């Protein structure tokens, strides 16, 4: 017999329910840490001989935008932030003319800018005017921020192709040169992941700065939002359920 925790999409065997209850209680104690380092690697992958590239996109709320790129193979880290405006040091409640954006750090040996553009187009409605979904306002506009002439060429070509797909409506996506990308406040980083405290426990209750830079947290952020490609979503499901079945190992920090 299995009981589905629909909100979190995991299945806990009936025999582990008592354990799960005490585990939930332990979540209140920040000294408790549950790690799955043997299950999912969080190896640092950027180094001088393996440099990462970055790209910045705006496609609505940065909570969901960050999650949309998190599970893509070759994407190492993501950060929610603000770009495209003139205001210095924007904040969530006072961002001026900036757009909520996501900075994507990726390994160019695994994924290219063209593939990131494909994710961008497939993850939002580029024809919606003055907002995205239920979020209305200029801060939720669709925009590609380019870092080079080559990125500008690829972005422009992809926009033309997107427009040809539907001639009955106009693609509203802007393309502009990236100025300064301002990282958003900590509360907005890995937002989807933070809605699932037990996933935070699984990776060891990282401090905020570590969580923001974690490749593992980046993947789990996409997973928590159910935005991973089906194969990856299923793979992480099985890993998490395996840990649950075995009885999560609890390590207490001293």
UniProtKB/Swiss-Prot annotation:
Keywords: Oxidoreductase, Signal. GO terms for molecular function: L-methionine:thioredoxin-disulfide S-oxidoreductase activity; peptide-methionine (S)-S-oxide reductase activity. Residues 1-33 form the signal peptide. It comes from the Eukaryota. InterPro entries: Met_Sox_Rdtase_MsrA_dom (IPR002569), Met_Sox_Rdtase_MsrA_sf (IPR036509), MsrA_MetSO_reductase (IPR050162). Gene3D superfamilies: Peptide methionine sulphoxide reductase MsrA. Its EC number is 1.8.4.11. It catalyses: L-methionyl-[protein] + [thioredoxin]-disulfide + H2O = L-methionyl-(S)-S-oxide-[protein] + [thioredoxin]-dithiol; [thioredoxin]-disulfide + L-methionine + H2O = L-methionine (S)-S-oxide + [thioredoxin]-dithiol. SUPFAM superfamilies: Peptide methionine sulfoxide reductase (SSF55068). NCBIfam families: msrA. Belongs to the MsrA Met sulfoxide reductase family. Catalyzes the reduction of methionine sulfoxide (MetSO) to methionine in proteins. Plays a protective role against oxidative stress by restoring activity to proteins that have been inactivated by methionine oxidation. MSRA family specifically reduces the MetSO S-enantiomer. This is Peptide methionine sulfoxide reductase A5. The lineage of its organism: Eukaryota, Viridiplantae, Streptophyta, Embryophyta, Tracheophyta.
């Amino acid at each position: 017999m299995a009981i589905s925790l629909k909100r979190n999409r995991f299945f806990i065997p009936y025999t582990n329910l008592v354990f799960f209850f005490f585990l939930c209680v332990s979540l209140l104690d920040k000294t408790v840490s549950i790690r799955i380092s043997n299950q999912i690697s969080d190896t640092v992958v950027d180094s001088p001989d393996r440099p990462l590239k970055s790209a910045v996109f705006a496609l609505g709320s940065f909570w969901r935008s960050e999650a949309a790129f998190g599970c893509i193979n070759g994407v190492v880290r993501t950060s929610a932030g603000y770009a495209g405006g003139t205001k210095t040091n924007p904040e969530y409640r006072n961002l001026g003319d900036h757009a909520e954006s996501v900075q994507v750090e990726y390994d160019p040996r695994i994924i290219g800018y063209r593939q990131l553009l494909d994710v961008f187009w497939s993850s939002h409605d580029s024809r919606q005017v003055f907002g995205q979904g239920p979020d209305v306002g200029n801060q939720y506009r669709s925009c590609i921020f380019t870092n080079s002439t080559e990125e500008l060429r690829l972005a422009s070509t992809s926009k033309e192709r997107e427009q040809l797909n539907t001639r009955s409506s106009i693609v509203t996506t802007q393309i502009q040169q990236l100025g300064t990308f301002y990282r958003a406040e900590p509360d907005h980083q890995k937002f989807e992941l933070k809605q699932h405290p037990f996933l935070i426990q699984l990776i060891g209750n990282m401090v905020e700065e570590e969580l923001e830079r974690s490749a593992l947290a980046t993947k789990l952020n996409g997973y928590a939002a159910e935005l991973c490609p089906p194969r990856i979503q299923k793979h992480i499901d099985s890993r998490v359920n395996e840990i649950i079945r075995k009885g999560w190992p609890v390590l207490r920090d001293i």
